[in-house]
Amino acid sequence: MNRFLLAAMTALMLPFTAAADEPVPVEVWVCDYKEGQTLSDLEDWYDDFNKLSDGMDNPNFEAWIWTPFFADLTMGDVLVVTSFPDLESMGQSMMEFFGGDETGALFARYQTIVDCTGRDLWMVQQMRDRD
């Protein structure tokens, strides 16, 4: 239940750049670092992920690393969060990422850094823009 609440609050608080009329899909992975791995390792992975993503046919997504600050620390070490403009774009990006040889190798490296025990998809609707 705590994992559910934290994931829900996290997804609802994502800072989208523009107010959306329709909810957008947000994928939330709940992860623990594998032995000897740290935030720095995950940040290094994201450097390579971003380079590879820039070359994808559909790089239309945003990604965040959420580290607990004032939260249920038993839930996980880190939340890995990705948002997409719509479900079609999400499907295209996921098929491309999980279906390619180079991207598959990158995901295999990701799995050496974190052990993700939860993966949820939320539909998030921004209700207030800070501008």
Language-model-detected regions and their locations in the chain:
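Positively charged n-region of N-terminal signal peptides that target proteins for export
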Residues: M1-F4
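Bacterial N-terminal signal peptides
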Residues: A7-P15
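Short S/T/G/P-rich N-terminal loop/turn motif that feeds into the first structured element of a domain
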Residues: L14, A18-D101, T112-D131
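Non-heme di-metal
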Residues: G104-F107
